[in-house]
């Protein structure tokens, strides 16, 4: 028997797996319909599946809404610190910041600057959920406030693209004060008679929704986006009631007057251009031609 086992061992050939040259992200599975989509085709559609599911974009990917070559970044040097010396059971906040910055290539959540859409100049601030859940900390608030003040100074509209899980707990009350700081900057924008257009994308929760994103002149949401302050489970546990199936979706918010329109990503560029043309024709910005033809809001 021993000899038989030894002979059988010699008869087997060890086959090592062949390493594939195909990168892991060539094919992307839709979280909704589970279809596999070639990454180049997905990029051409701005990460919208054929089933209509809107996947998350990075802040840099959102900048494709702007005219090519028009974006000039501001405040890229701003980086968050660790004012509380926060340490959780899993890791220190300072370590988490360094790792997230390395992984995303961002200094913090917000990328901001000045660009144009079909020739209409605007100040823009875009959130990236990949950076600690899009949480609102000191640099987030500072960049957003500066973007609003820049728009007021230059006499151009402000466009914010918002996705967030709420205030950054690692920065404590410093994070919470950003809500008031950004809203104060927006009052100066309003005094300069410049519009704030907010785009809410999935997910948009906490302090961002509770502050500046909900007081914009025009609020646009993407289809299916989850928007709210507290999460669904927290609310249900608090009020001890079952919420509607579509609660906190963009469509629910539109039905109840919390957003002005729900716009698919493929149509967003055109809608923004029409809105900018509308404000320009009203003479609210010296940066625009007074001869522009204004569309009606109903036609957008």
From Swiss-Prot:
Pathway membership, UniProt: Lipid metabolism; malonyl-CoA biosynthesis; malonyl-CoA from acetyl-CoA: step 1/1
GO function terms (MF aspect): acetyl-CoA carboxylase activity; ATP binding; carboxyl- or carbamoyltransferase activity; zinc ion binding
One of the protein's GO biological processes: fatty acid biosynthetic process
Cofactor: how and how many bound: Binds 1 zinc ion per subunit.
E.C. number(s) listed in UniProt: 2.1.3.15
Cofactor: Zn(2+)
Pfam families listed in its UniProt record: Carboxyl_trans (PF01039), Zn_ribbon_ACC (PF17848)
Entry function: Component of the acetyl coenzyme A carboxylase (ACC) complex. Biotin carboxylase (BC) catalyzes the carboxylation of biotin on its carrier protein (BCCP) and then the CO(2) group is transferred by the transcarboxylase to acetyl-CoA to form malonyl-CoA.
Descriptive protein name: Acetyl-coenzyme A carboxylase carboxyl transferase subunit beta 2
Biological source species: Roseiflexus castenholzii (strain DSM 13941 / HLO8)
Lineage of source species: Bacteria, Bacillati, Chloroflexota, Chloroflexia, Chloroflexales
